Amino acid sequence: MHKSQKSFYAPFLTLLFGGMLLFATETAVAQTDTSFWFAAPEVANSHGDRPIGLKFTSQGLAAQVKISLPANPAVNPMLVNVPASGVSSINLSTWIDSIENFPANTILNKGIHISSSTPITAYYEVVVTNNPDIFALKGRNALGTSFMIPGQDIMANAHGRNAFDIVATEDQTTITIIPTDTLEGGRMPGVPFTIVLNKGETFSCRSHGTNTYDKLIGSRVTSDKPIAITLIDDSVRGGSIYNGGCFDLLGDQLIPIQQLGMEFIVQRGFLDVHNNNSNTRTERVIVMAVENGTQVFLDGSATAVTTLSAGQTYHRRMGNNLPVTYIRTSKPAYVMHITGFGCETGWAVIPAIQCTGSSLVGFMRSTSERFGFTVITRTNNINSFSLNGNAYGISFTAVPGTNNEWHYARVERAANDTAEFNTSTGYILSNSTGNFHLGIIN
């Protein structure tokens, strides 16, 4: 068991190599919406920070999508047309200096707003070969007034830092931040500070160091009006654990505390892991409590493996002999998954299974590197999948501890195996009888 807490706690898809994209809709982490707010992270140029772009999938009806920077009228809005049940993308690299949130500790005008004429799913991606990741945009369910920052403390940074970026959705938004580590600009751990942002303005909180202990886990952010937060951990040394020279970007858009759940299913991805779950070289599921007295239960057991205080984390290790785990918490919690391919790492905020999922998800394969996806659905839905309108058979297995209510599956294609999933086609995975959760690793 790995259980950690910062030394001071103040009371108060497509991407190359290691990224993970999780799709789910409604309740906890809805991603099908007509309005999205996003703060694009500053990614280390020294390790590669471009191309960057957005991808959109329509939900049965054609969509006209507008991308704007509300606080920066010098950047003209961009329009993207998405065909019915189709996928479209836009390269934003030309505007990278107007989009990425740099410097830290400064009020900026770089918030992105996406509006659509009909419901869509959307994600932002960094598509550089050696430092990619994807950020699933969560629409209205990314917006809230109370957040705690989750994260990892097992991999140091080779380039860049651990950071979180805030975007305001309304004028005169007062935001209070309590960091758990020293920030660039001299903000001290445990010392609250307040900023005021207008609609579309952003603020980046960036750790001052690159060590495993220079993380912002457990930091608090509260506001009087809805905000959205992007979390990154740039160029982490995955090779230090998973055998190799890999440095990779980890990132996702957070959900606020009021959207958190208490039941989660996580599938192991494709990292180079050990057979023994107690070995360091395993994938990690990281549970972070937001309330004191949060118990963590595994795989249907009635006995808690640990009890966490707010800001503490529990690491569930997943070796080759643990393909899936069912996690239940006694109080709402953040759950993150570190996964990827080989030693190339990515992470994602895991949606609670109380979230009903989606009956239709679109994705694209960016390159011919290794590609895979994971699927979780209720038992009644396992024989009802279609890919681009054609029946699609997937081999499912029951999730232990769920009384046969949930099943999981994974599909993997080797590098350069593009017979089924190529890099020029948009794909729609759908289910005719129910909803599902889809994770993309590419």
PLM regions: where:
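Bacterial N-terminal signal peptides
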Residues: 11-24
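N-terminal secretory signal peptides that target proteins for export/translocation
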Residues: 1-10
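Extracellular lectin-like interaction modules
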Residues: 31-442
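Sec/Tat signal peptide C-region and signal peptidase I cleavage site
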Residues: 25-30
